[in-house]
Amino acid sequence: MAYKPQFYPGQTKIAQNRRDHMNPDVQLEKLRDIPDDDVVKIMGHRQPGEDYKTVHPPLEEMDLPEDYVRDLVEPLNGAKEGHRIRYIQFTDSMYFAPAQPYDRARTYMWRFRGVDTGTLSGRQVIEMRESDLEALSKNFLIDTAFFDPARIGIRGATVHGHSLRLDENGLMFDALQRYVYDEKTGHVLYVKDQVGRPLDEPVDVGEPLPEEKLKEITTIYRIDGVPMREDEELLTVVKRIHRARTLGGFLPVEDVFEKL
């Protein structure tokens, strides 16, 4: 019988949102359409229209030894062309952001190939071939309900702010002030790229989502939202893992695991 992945335990809306993020068969709601060139500007690795820099010749031009694994795995387009590795990094506010670091790590690994990612307390980096990363960033990481202009920041450096209070417009604090709230349009504008270099012209990433919408799609348990302690199934799994790691790792005897 084929294995059907469960993705994540829990019976609450938060648990279901996490499962939806991780499940490659679930198509997240598209909320905006940021032009490709604007995504390139925010990432800051190349100029719009500039050729991709390469680190090796196209694979079809390379004289490589036989490798069964390489024959089995279809390379990404960026790998085929020899494009270099680049990154994009996001900071997620604790105030009902749609995504958060561990959710991002699990989602990236379930949905995408050829990625490397690193989890920190308030930010998550993803690295892959540059051309593939640009497409992934636009089509999933920014255009969909995985992103909110106010509660998620694209920050390659000086990422602090995820746990700080929001400003009067609901924007997460950013020490480099990469984005501003346009009171005329109600949209968020990026005036700097992800590492804080000023842009020639602002990039419009759309209108912040209403608080009700954020609470509906967030993957964060909060006492003023959906408390984690309300999800009995999740608590059972977390306690089991904690007990197995603590007691099993320290003294891996049969009676420890019988009590799990």
Curated annotation (Swiss-Prot):
Keyword terms, alphabetized: Cytoplasm, Methanogenesis, Transferase
Catalytic activity: coenzyme B + methyl-coenzyme M = methane + coenzyme M-coenzyme B heterodisulfide
GO CC annotation: cytoplasm
CDD domains with a match to the protein in the record: MCR_gamma
Cofactor: coenzyme F430
Protein location: Cytoplasm
Enzyme class: transferase
GO MF annotation list: coenzyme-B sulfoethylthiotransferase activity
Organism domain of life: Archaea
Single GO biological process annotation from the record: methanogenesis
Alphabetical list of NCBIfam families matching this protein: met_CoM_red_gam
Summary of the function given for this chain in its UniProt record: Component of the methyl-coenzyme M reductase (MCR) I that catalyzes the reductive cleavage of methyl-coenzyme M (CoM-S-CH3 or 2-(methylthio)ethanesulfonate) using coenzyme B (CoB or 7-mercaptoheptanoylthreonine phosphate) as reductant which results in the production of methane and the mixed heterodisulfide of CoB and CoM (CoM-S-S-CoB). This is the final step in methanogenesis.
Protein name stated in the entry: Methyl-coenzyme M reductase I subunit gamma
